[in-house]
Amino acid sequence: MSEQNQAADAQQDENKLIAERRAKLAELRAVGNPFPNDFRPTHHADALQQAHGSKEKAALEEAAMVVSVAGRVIRNRGAFMVLQDGSGQIQLYVTKEARGFAKSLDLGDIIGVSGVLHKSGKGDLYVNLDEYKLLTKALRPLPDKYHGLADQELRYRQRYVDLIANPEVRKTFLLRSRIVQFIRDYLNGREFLEVETPMLQAIPGGATARPFETHHNALDIDMYLRIAPELYLKRLVVGGFERVYEINRNFRNEGLSTRHNPEFTMLEFYQAYADYNDLMDLTEDMLRNLAQTVLGSTEVTATLGEDESVTYDFAKPFVRLSVFDSILHFNPDLKAEDIDSPESARAVAKNLGIPMKDNWGLGKVQIEIFEKTVEHRLIQPTFITEYPTEVSPLARRNDDNPFVTDRFEFFVGGREIANGFSELNDAEDQADRFKQQVAEKNAGDDEAMHYDADYVRALEYGLPPTAGEGIGIDRLVMLLTDSASIRDVLLFPHMRPE
């Protein structure tokens, strides 16, 4: 039988089951409300397992504790059912009086149950169905328990079913929440202030990216979904908030990949009277403590292939290499003179098959060589520093070498996780760099920055020496949950319409 015929038969079977369930719902409507809202559980499944799972059977019998639980029926066989709530699963014992009720249920129905808590001879907790009520009639059948929801695209489209059917998916998103909460606690504990800045901006700034465009009808102006909150956060530092951070969405009208989604979550934070070295130290400490607190270990194991894995060690001091030195380190056939002039660097890039534009300077060519030959090889936690000024329009020039900036990017597993730098606080230098970005935009670079006159004006009031950083929350969660695609850590990733 062809796959197409199998799919058609499966759809026909599902339609039949849905019709049968709709008929049951009609019968329930005829005798009352099949969607009541008057049941209140006293316990969750996991809390019961934690509090009473180790107790002796006799002790539970003697206690005769009555509990109320609510959730979805995911198994219904004979004398026992399995109920799944937001915390986990627990068994239900079908008493003689409850057999008719149990028989009327379909997998996926949501019920409320009150009864005495017991332990079986095998050591499993269960709740007697002494009192019971249907709370929600499910009209669509759950995926087969042995195969789960296997279709990857369907999992992303119908995440609500994915969460019901696949416990590991639930675990990933619970862990994501804990990661974000740890970061908030860590920064709050260091006197950072959480703020919110505009998502709709008249001038998109803070990053080099193509924005989403919209129109504000009341003001009759074109606006953009923000690509980064950076320039607003630094305005707040000018205003006297010396440590600020924001965890929120950014939007970039660019391609989809396993590492990119047009809508994504970023942490950005700024600290006055600090430089990029201070933020590298902070990042190293934060990530080390994050792994230990959330995962219980500073060693994070990730899958590279079917039979290959790697362990990222967050306990050791993170490697620190400049862009220039990293190119030479990972390309031992190259010498310094091969990449220290526009002509020689272009020759190297050409040999690597890198397409180039005529207006690229040495710094841009070096970054292209770095991304082609180095980035994917940065497996253990590594800071890459001293990015060329040409590709760092908001970063402070290095005092000893103005060709580069006091900037770093942080990599693990060949993925960029963070980007930070000592902030450019020279208003005149910033204005000149904005003008250069505008020239590049006029030359056809859609990702080049706009000129932000108000931000330059803010700098003219004086931005104290400041360092700032952005960390991609989605990529960080991918790293710590060993997820292969960014879609695996987004509850509702973008998809084409069905």
From Swiss-Prot:
Required cofactor names: Mg(2+)
GO cellular component entries: cytosol
Swiss-Prot/TrEMBL catalytic activity: tRNA(Lys) + L-lysine + ATP = L-lysyl-tRNA(Lys) + AMP + diphosphate
Binding site for Mg(2+) 2: E416
Gene Ontology biological process terms in this record: lysyl-tRNA aminoacylation
Gene3D superfamilies found in the cross-reference section: Bira Bifunctional Protein, Domain 2, Nucleic acid-binding proteins
Location in the cell: Cytoplasm
The record's free-text note on cofactor binding: Binds 3 Mg(2+) ions per subunit.
MF term (GO), any: ATP binding
Record key words, sorted: Aminoacyl-tRNA synthetase, ATP-binding, Cytoplasm, Ligase, Magnesium, Metal-binding, Nucleotide-binding, Protein biosynthesis
Residues binding Mg(2+) 1, per UniProt: E409, E416
Entry EC number(s): 6.1.1.6
Family according to the record: Belongs to the class-II aminoacyl-tRNA synthetase family.
Subunit structure of this chain's protein: Homodimer.
Protein name (record): Lysine--tRNA ligase
Species assigned in the record: Teredinibacter turnerae (strain ATCC 39867 / T7901)
